[in-house]
Amino acid sequence: MNLKKMMQGLVFFLTSLLVFVFLFRALLPTASPRMTKPKTAAKEITYTYVALGDSLTEGVGDSTKQGGFVPILAQSLSNENDGHYQPVNYGVAGNTSDQILDRLKKQTDLQKDLKKAHVMTLTVGGNDLRKVVVDHLSDFSLSDIRKPLKSYTANLKEIITKARKDNPQLPIYVVGIYNPLYLNFPELTSIQTAVDRWNETTEETIAQFDQVYFVPINDLLYKGIDGEMGVSEVSDGKAPIANDALYEEDRFHPNNTGYEKMKQAILEKINATKKTWN
């Protein structure tokens, strides 16, 4: 009898203990782990933007010394699209089309960047025409550009072909040339006609390629910001005209405002054509 009571008491004790432990664990808040695994943020895609060309790509005249239209175009592309556009600037002041082509053949860094590039801009031709004008300054005529224009056209085709050697679908935006002398020498109509002919030839040449686009800038720059007369500077009874879209130290290259206008023109062309990219 005593044994039976002892067994009943033991069972009651164990049952009570189990109930107590269960209730205690249920009421005790679960401790949070000290370290929680952070959520992995979506990795931003980086696109390589290769800028190849002459002083317009290098950014001569840009007071910030950051590279003219190139970095601000990359920033605008990053702001308006998914991913970050990383610019790589291969602009060299004074380069003619044959010098740009020579760099394209020899610079391994340039070749590697083009292989992975998502988009490319090209400024070329201005120094080719400038050399002709300087060589025939006193008697320049349209016939003087015939042979240089033919050489330039061949170089341009080869530049595009070699730029796409390892990246055949690379979209390329070729920027036209402009006449920086117009405001001060509007009577030199042969120079403006030569600029127009040069741009027409560039546009005709690149039309032979898919996903190569022409961006005209002459009308944006050659008459100044207001598109009419620029800024007059009167001195000793004379009134030379300063093109307010050009760098005041040489009146040849764009200034910050000029580069902003170039950037906007290229950006608008990219936005209008990127749906055609493969």
Can you say where each PLM-predicted feature lies in the sequence?
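Serine-esterase "nucleophile elbow" of acetyl-processing enzymes
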Residues: 28-91, 110-112
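Oxyanion-hole/transition-state-stabilizing segment in secreted/luminal serine hydrolases
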Residues: 102-147
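Surface-exposed cleft-lining segments at the edges of enzyme active sites
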Residues: 92-93, 97, 129, 136-151, ...
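Substrate-gating cap/lid alpha-helix
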Residues: 16, 180-219
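Structural recognition of the beta-strand scaffold that forms the well-ordered cores
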Residues: 48-51, 86-91, 118-123, 171-176, ...
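Hydrophobic membrane-insertion alpha-helices, especially the h-region
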Residues: 8-26
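Mobile gating loops/cap/lid regions near enzyme active sites that modulate substrate access
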Residues: 217-249
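Histidine-centered active-site loop/cap adjacent to the catalytic His
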Residues: 238-278
